[in-house]
């Protein structure tokens, strides 16, 4: 039992360390330290889809402030790039840990505990467009494939990912599968191609509903991308044979500029956010144009090690029935 546990831990560490090294080298980012707490009222917290409640923390020796455990570091990273004067094409990555207690369900792929490579880069002049988004996606996908090949060489786990990732807009997906739900569309397209980047998540589609929810103040999901489609963000999905479903490894996108921010808070009815310090800084042109996202560490390990439950690669909290069902929950 001890031997199996140690081997399990070594596999997880190998995936995380290998991916980190490749990501830093290929994406050309530096690894930095990030916070676990965000001060309430400065606008730095990531509100995700807008309905999740963060964990509140009161610090004894800072009585006049309330803090929250971060959901992600989407806004903090952009603030940090500006604060320390990162140049065009430069960026950072954080070994981010967070809590999301309002997950809809605790299942094979969702946990209260979130660990991800949270990264952000300053966009080179004139490249705030879909082409640059795709180029960055291809770089990250290359890192995923290189890590998979390293796992194959070390642990004899067969590599399954295609050499290329397929790009498709959510608006195209609705037209292609008009009678399917968003999740069913993801399953259909990802099973066909093996690896997909789904472009444009957050805006209302021709069927009157968004593919999925996104907060209005980090990704740009309203700007036109190409051919009348909208959204400069998306998700990297791979086909997970163990689960028989599409499997999200990363959510990322070009971040809002001043116009996209104002447009999107009008759509979502979150105009009050513009009074926060972070949002004022953006509107006053104090932040660089950036691209960024999060890549799930436990999800990456789960996929590359062919595990059936995320609890096999991270230590979290689970209902007893989950522990009774899966022998290798940590």
Curated annotation (Swiss-Prot):
Pfam family, one: AsnA
GO cellular component terms given for this protein: cytosol
Gene Ontology molecular function terms on file: aspartate-ammonia ligase activity; ATP binding; catalytic activity, acting on a protein; transferase activity
InterPro entries: aa-tRNA-synth_II (IPR006195), aa-tRNA-synth_II/BPL/LPL (IPR045864), AsnA (IPR004618)
Subcellular location: Cytoplasm
CDD domains: AsnA (cd00645)
Gene3D superfamilies tied to this protein: Bira Bifunctional Protein, Domain 2 (3.30.930.10)
Record key words, sorted: Amino-acid biosynthesis, Asparagine biosynthesis, ATP-binding, Cytoplasm, Ligase, Nucleotide-binding
Pathway in which this enzyme or protein is active: Amino-acid biosynthesis; L-asparagine biosynthesis; L-asparagine from L-aspartate (ammonia route): step 1/1
GO biological process: L-asparagine biosynthetic process
E.C. number: 6.3.1.1
Main location (coarse class): cytoplasm
Reaction catalyzed: L-aspartate + NH4(+) + ATP = L-asparagine + AMP + diphosphate + H(+)
Homology family: Belongs to the class-II aminoacyl-tRNA synthetase family. AsnA subfamily.
HAMAP family documented for this protein: AsnA (MF_00555)
Annotated protein name in UniProt: Aspartate--ammonia ligase
Lineage: Bacteria, Bacillati, Bacillota, Bacilli, Lactobacillales
Gene name for this UniProt entry: asnA
């Amino acid at each position: 039992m001890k031997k199996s546990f140690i081997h399990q831990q070594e596999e997880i560490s190998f995936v995380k360390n290998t991916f980190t090294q490749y990501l830093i080298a290929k994406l050309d980012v530096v690894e930095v330290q990030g916070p676990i707490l965000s001060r309430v009222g400065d606008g730095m917290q990531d509100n995700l889809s807008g309905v999740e409640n963060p964990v509140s923390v009161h610090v004894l020796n800072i009585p006049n402030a309330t803090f929250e455990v971060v959901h992600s570091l989407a806004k903090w990273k952009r603030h940090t790039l500006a604060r320390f004067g990162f140049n065009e094409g430069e960026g950072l990555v954080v070994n981010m840990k967070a809590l999301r207690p309002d997950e809809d369900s605790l299942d094979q792929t969702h946990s209260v505990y979130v660990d991800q490579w949270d990264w952000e880069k300053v966009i080179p002049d004139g490249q705030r467009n879909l082409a640059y988004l795709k180029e960055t996606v291809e770089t990250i996908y290359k890192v995923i494939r290189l890590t998979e090949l390293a796992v194959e060489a070390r642990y004899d786990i067969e590599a399954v990912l295609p050499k290329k990732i397929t790009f498709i807009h959510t608006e195209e997906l609705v037209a292609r599968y008009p009678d399917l739900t968003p999740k069913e569309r993801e399953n259909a397209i990802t099973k066909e191609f093996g690896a997909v980047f789904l472009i444009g998540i957050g805006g209302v589609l021709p069927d009157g509903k968004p593919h999925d929810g996104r907060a209005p103040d980090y990704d740009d999901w309203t700007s036109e991308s190409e051919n009348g489609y909208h959204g400069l963000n998306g998700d990297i999905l791979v086909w997970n044979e163990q689960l028989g479903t599409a499997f999200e490894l990363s959510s990322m996108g070009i971040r809002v500029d001043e116009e996209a921010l104002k447009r999107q808070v009008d759509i979502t009815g979150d105009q009050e956010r513009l009074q926060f310090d972070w949002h004022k800084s953006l509107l006053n042109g104090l932040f660089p144009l950036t691209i960024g996202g999060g890549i799930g560490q436990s999800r990456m390990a789960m996929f590359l090690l062919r595990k059936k439950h995320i609890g096999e690669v991270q230590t979290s909290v689970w209902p007893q029935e989950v522990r009774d069902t899966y022998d290798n929950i940590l």
